[in-house]
Amino acid sequence: VHLSDGEKNAISTAWGKVNAADIGAEALGRLLVVYPWTQRFFDSFGDLSSASAVMGNAKVKAHGKKVIDSFSNGLKHLDNLKGTFASLSELHCDKLHVDPENFKLLGNMIVIVMAHHLGKDFTPEAQAAFQKVVAGVANALAHKYH
């Protein structure tokens, strides 16, 4: 992903103001609520029968933290997202058979949750930069599908 210095600064500033684990848990939870067909990949997570069940589910929160930790690592390697996410792309493609469109949906959830948590501090410039990043991450995760 090519980002200007201003975009990199906007990402760093915004990311520095949030609790990553909270962002991950809420983003994954929202994905499972808003796009319920994504729940099929999480059969072992127990009760996902309602929005409150999903958002309060400890396994959703734990996996959301794993997801956002990987995303956070990607923020440190913006010039090599395909390499950074190669093993996760292979896992999600070959073993889990996740539809790569879901990566785009999750990226959008991350942006929505960032906006929710940061309010006015999530400027249009920061959003534009994050949209580039989540698109780049989704593309990197879908790489093994091509």
Curated annotation (Swiss-Prot):
Q: Which GO terms describe its biological process?
A: hydrogen peroxide catabolic process
Q: Which Pfam families match?
A: Globin
S-nitrosocysteine (modified residue): where? 93
Q: Which PROSITE patterns match?
A: GLOBIN
Q: Which residues carry this modification: N6-acetyllysine?
A: 59, 82, 144
Keyword Iron tagged: yes
Which keywords describe this protein according to UniProt? Acetylation, Heme, Iron, Metal-binding, Oxygen transport, Phosphoprotein, S-nitrosylation, Transport
Q: Which InterPro entries match?
A: Globin, Globin-like_sf, Globin/Proto, Hemoglobin_b, Hemoglobin_oxygen_transport
Keyword Chaperone among UniProt keywords: no
Positions of modified residues (N-acetylvaline): 1
Residues that coordinate or bind heme b: 63, 92
Q: Note the superkingdom of the native organism.
A: Eukaryota
| CC annotations in GO | blood microparticle; haptoglobin-hemoglobin complex; hemoglobin complex
- What positions are modified (Phosphoserine)? 44
The free-text tissue note of the record is: Red blood cells.
A molecular function annotated in GO for this UniProt entry is: hemoglobin alpha binding
Q: Where is the Globin domain?
A: 2-146
Q: Which PANTHER family match?
A: HEMOGLOBIN FAMILY MEMBER, HEMOGLOBIN SUBUNIT BETA
Describe, as the record does, how this protein assembles with itself and its partners: Heterotetramer of two alpha chains and two beta chains.
Family per UniProt?
Answer: Belongs to the globin family.
User: What name appears for this protein in its UniProt entry?
Assistant: Hemoglobin subunit beta
Organism ancestry: Eukaryota, Metazoa, Chordata, Craniata, Vertebrata
Originating gene: HBB
